[in-house]
Amino acid sequence: MKESIAVLGAGSWGTALAVLLAHKGFRVNLWARRPELATALRETGENKTYLPGVRLTGTIIPTADLPAAVKGAGLVVLSVPSHAVRSTARLLKPFLPKGTVVVNTAKGLELETKKRLSQVLVEEGLDRVAVLSGPSHAEEVGRGLPTTVVVAAADRETAEYVQDVFMDPTFRVYTNPDIIGVEFGGALKNIIALATGMADGLGLGDNTRAALMTRGMAEIARLGVALGGKVLTFAGLSGIGDLIVTCTSMYSRNRRAGILLGKGQSLEEVLDAVGMVVEGVRTTAAARELACQHGIKMPITEEIYQVLYKGKPVGDCVAALMERPRTHEVESGDW
């Protein structure tokens, strides 16, 4: 048996990663915040709430005891929603040996501070942090379908350590030193998935979806590069790769939420119907404020913000985007 790994967060993604790591021979302590969920996982051998149909092997140990989950773990995987990253880090820190690698898998920004989640973890005293991102729906990873992702960290040793832990015949992992770009790509694509979902809900067709994805990628890269990311990162797995899967997949919560909004449901009704965290809602507000602070144009993000927080009709956003003043496609383009 290999070293043990703690996966904190027993939602769909945490469960899928626990299954992947257990398949590789690791003992996995899967921490659930709610004791009743941990009990259900132990008794049924399945996460029927968040990842039904995927069996949990005997080397996955569900628990609601955080100190027990972390004790002896060579690696900690953080799979909680973005708004819970800081509070979970504070719970984790007293029990974490110095130098333990913590891999964040949430894709979002902290709404209150507008900070990337790796920044939040470092602020809370976690000294070796990596980020795992890319086009990777839990429903497919849990079933062992081929998936390719990227891990970013401040140093190569940490990134390659995480790469080796997760690399599997069905789960290919690349490394990237650009942690800023990787995090912004993973977070901001959820906004564009809301937009494409709204277009689908309105029945606007493939042309509209393609336009939103393409111009959405321009917005993502514009803000990400302004805040220190590398432009090529946004052409990679954590950028365009994650954008494609999140904007087109039936598994995408953000796309599903957008579809329901496009069909006229209120945000409250949509969140209740989806039943799980829709990261794009909070990320839209955080990204809009960052864009305003840094003078970055993000017209799609602005329109999604108006829908989510100001009650603007979705159909009016289409007209607002289509009737913007004419401009160049590529800002640096010369004739």
UniProtKB/Swiss-Prot annotation:
Record carries keyword Lipid biosynthesis: yes
Catalytic reaction equation(s): sn-glycerol 3-phosphate + NAD(+) = dihydroxyacetone phosphate + NADH + H(+); sn-glycerol 3-phosphate + NADP(+) = dihydroxyacetone phosphate + NADPH + H(+)
Keyword entries, A-Z: Cytoplasm, Lipid biosynthesis, Lipid metabolism, NAD, NADP, Nucleotide-binding, Oxidoreductase, Phospholipid biosynthesis, Phospholipid metabolism
Any Pfam family matching the protein: NAD_Gly3P_dh_N
Main location: cytoplasm
Active site per UniProt: 189 (proton acceptor)
Location in or out of the cell: Cytoplasm
Entry protein name: Glycerol-3-phosphate dehydrogenase [NAD(P)+]
